Amino acid sequence: MIFCVVVVGVPLVWAIYLSLTDASGGSLSGHFIGFQNFTDAWHDQNFRNALENTVIITFASQAIVVVGAAILSHHLVRDFRGKWFVRLLVILPWAAPVALVTIVWLWILDSLLSVLSWTLGKMHLLGAVCGAFGVHGCSAANPPPWLGHPKLAMFSIIVVQAWRILPFAVIIFIAGRASIPSEVDDAARIDGATALKKLWYVDLPLQLPIALVAVLFGIVFTAVDFAVVYLLTHGGPFNSTQVLPTWAYAVGIDSGSLGAGAAISLFLFPLLVLVTILMLFFARRAQVS
């Protein structure tokens, strides 16, 4: 209890205090200005872009995560040779430090030495993928700037975020599948249900509550993430990939406006609380006994 108060409570209260003042760099106090920082942030176009990017990246990545976790868990619960090794490979992105794996992605998405560009080029898909984002003329000799073009940079961040959260969701889905009584599977097979029908009419409805839990954690982890966007693009190019955590850092730390930065960071708090309440509500409604 004391640990939670010190680690969570004190910083939160201090951030709320700073958001109501005009505190700047070099000082942890300032004059009380009420909700002026929140009003200024809301009318700032850069803030609105960061908020929009946060929502897009969060929900787009979670859509990929849910589909990927459902497919992977469906196969990983079966018995096959090397099952433990495949599970190890799946969980590695979650176990590795975020900064480390993001630096690896920097190499994968490098504008000159990109292994992704090389792979897509060998598959003759590079031009089609780039064209889907309005970038034309891409080839092995002219690789795309994955992190230098606004649309490609957003797409890259969504993929990295989904890849990072996917292992956690897979673990939750596997646990959910393990909780399904064997009698249910036996009854479905006796009724002649195909694998696809069993997945759609039996497995997914029974896993819905735990899937909502996975989505909830994924939304929270992605929305508050700072490292991926900061290390990949620093919010660029031209602030096109700024999210609320990186924009709060840019305003509060880089620009020295501690009060304004604290206000920006606190915008996420009520949104995440609302998402949590809604997800738990629907999880309870969808629970199957």
Q: For each predicted feature, which ranges?
A:
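A structural signal for multi-pass alpha-helical bundles of membrane permease subunits
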Residues: 1-289
